[in-house]
């Protein structure tokens, strides 16, 4: 989680953190407290307009900026998840222009999606986050995340029997139901009630009824036996697929 340098001085000092300077106030504060003990990174705003110094702020304060003991110049791409978006090149070109002020400094503009845009976006350092765990859709990346959900109980229900809070699911036939130890308090979104799935290997097992705080009920009638656990993901259903079913993005998941 990003923190402001101003107000976090003790944390930076005690944990020997290299702060990222995003504005002139932080630059002055860094020089006042850490100039002799720490190095810093400088973030440039190349178009996302979220954090960092824009072109005017940079060139209007070169005296203070060039006096900083910097070890990295960085920026962040707004549209890196869209390979065809021309804004990626626009930001990269502006980044290169601004970095001419720091010719020998290490540079970084690519986070996870940015690493897939090509070598010209890699510079001296890339900053993969979610990409380390396979959370972005790319056939060349291995997905290493798995969550195993224990089966607590299983039972058989007959046709027209109902399941879960407010009986939002009615059985259309005799079926075997498993109750598993995971609910919305554990991060399984309620939006998946009656339409999500867990997995036995590659076999999907539909979620039936409402997902409750710590429990979820699943149809396992089609499985060869009673499993000890089911999985959140499968080789054909990864974090990005799960996120789409939750109507969100893999970073939030």
Please place each PLM-identified region on the residue numbering.
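Single conserved hydrophobic/aromatic residue that forms the stacking wall/gate
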Residues: 1-7, 11-12
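Structured helix-beta-strand junction loops
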Residues: 14-15, 76
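Short active-site oxyanion
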Residues: 15-19, 106
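Broad gene-expression machinery/nucleic-acid interaction feature
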Residues: 16, 39, 125, 146-148, ...
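Active-site loop/helix belt of alpha/beta enzymes
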Residues: 25-39, 44-159
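C-terminal accessory subdomain/extension
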Residues: 156-253
């Amino acid at each position: 989680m990003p923190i402001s340098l101003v107000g976090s001085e003790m944390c930076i000092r005690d944990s020997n953190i290299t702060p990222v300077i995003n504005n002139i106030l932080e630059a002055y504060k860094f020089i006042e407290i850490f100039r002799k003990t720490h190095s810093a990174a400088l973030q440039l705003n190349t178009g996302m307009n979220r954090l960092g110094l824009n072109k005017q702020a940079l060139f209007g304060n070169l005296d203070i900026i060039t006096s900083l003991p910097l070890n990295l110049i960085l920026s962040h791409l707004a549209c890196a998840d869209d390979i065809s978006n021309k804004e990626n090149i626009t930001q990269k070109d502006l980044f290169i222009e601004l970095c001419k002020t720091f010719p020998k400094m290490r540079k970084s503009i690519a986070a996870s999606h940015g690493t897939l845009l090509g070598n010209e976006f890699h510079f001296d350092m890339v900053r993969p986050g979610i990409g380390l765990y396979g959370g972005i859709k790319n056939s060349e990346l291995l997905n290493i995340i798995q969550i195993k959900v224990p089966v607590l109980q299983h039972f058989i229900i007959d046709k027209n029997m109902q399941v879960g809070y407010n009986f939002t699911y009615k059985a259309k036939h005799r079926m075997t139901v498993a109750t598993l130890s995971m609910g919305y308090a554990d991060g399984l979104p309620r939006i998946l009630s009656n339409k999500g799935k867990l997995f036995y290997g590659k076999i999907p097992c539909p979620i039936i009824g409402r997902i409750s705080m710590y429990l979820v009920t699943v149809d396992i009638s089609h499985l060869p036996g009673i499993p000890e656990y089911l999985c959140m993901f499968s080789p054909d259903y990864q974090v990005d697929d799960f996120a789409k079913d939750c109507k969100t993005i893999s970073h939030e998941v």
